């Protein structure tokens, strides 16, 4: 059953890329939902991802672990967008900011240019 604490919305682009917009809490109870959503995107051929944290109120170690799982699963690029100071601090302190770093790119603009 989907959590009431995390909403995941996906924008798919014809370039094999997608933006995943999160709202709520990314924690022990909800992190598997993000991993599953990204796995489904990969199965559908979306390998380049932006994960938009603009609506995330809380991210705990399980949320960080989900990002590592996504990274290790072979997604070509993961860009983390709109990180609040707490999440940015966690990523910096754990070394994940460097591990997950990807060059900035505007997937929506790129999709418009292709289409």
Identify the role of each PLM range.
Residues 1-58, 62, 66-115:
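STAS-like cytosolic regulatory interaction modules
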